[in-house]
Amino acid sequence: MQWVAEQFESCTFLEEENVIRSVEFEEAGGILFCFCVQSKGFLRVDFRPLENQKIAVQLTLEEGAEAMVRLLCHGRERSDFTFRTLQRHVGNGSKSVVEVRCVCEDEARVDYRGKIEVPEHITGVKAEQKNKNLLLSTEAYVYTEPAMDIRSKDVECFHGAAVGGIDPEVLRYFSMRGMEKLSAQELYIAGFLN
């Protein structure tokens, strides 16, 4: 696992009891993380990839398992990020949250596609997939495609995506309290990515 620290600014694995993990390189130059969270296990993973990263995360959740995965990136200049996530619920009562938050400045690009899968006869599942993007330049670009394949009726699954800039009223609020625009913007970005 030594190479993980070299690939990312931050990659934190917490609460790994009852988790089987395999990490592999993809042919396309990206990294694939596969996690199987066993019965009643819990996993929390935070990724803060550096520029020009391709990351795919696949979660498989057994009965009563829980997982939370966050991908947080700040693209500058011509950074190019590609993220793929798959949340596979194969056990009753499993829960997952995937949250992708990106800030894009200059000509940075983000391509995110995620999917939640729940097969027939699996019940009590709670799954969320959230993608929030902050564009700070007219040249920055975000493509987002959240998806769900839900084949069971007794589940609570949500997905959504948002793309926008910093609310001018927020910057005005900070300005009225004596904070310069650049400092206010940096504070807003830090809060957005936390």
What do these predicted ranges mean?
Residues 1-172, 176-179, 193-194:
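Conserved beta-strand/loop scaffold segments within soluble protein domains that form the structured core
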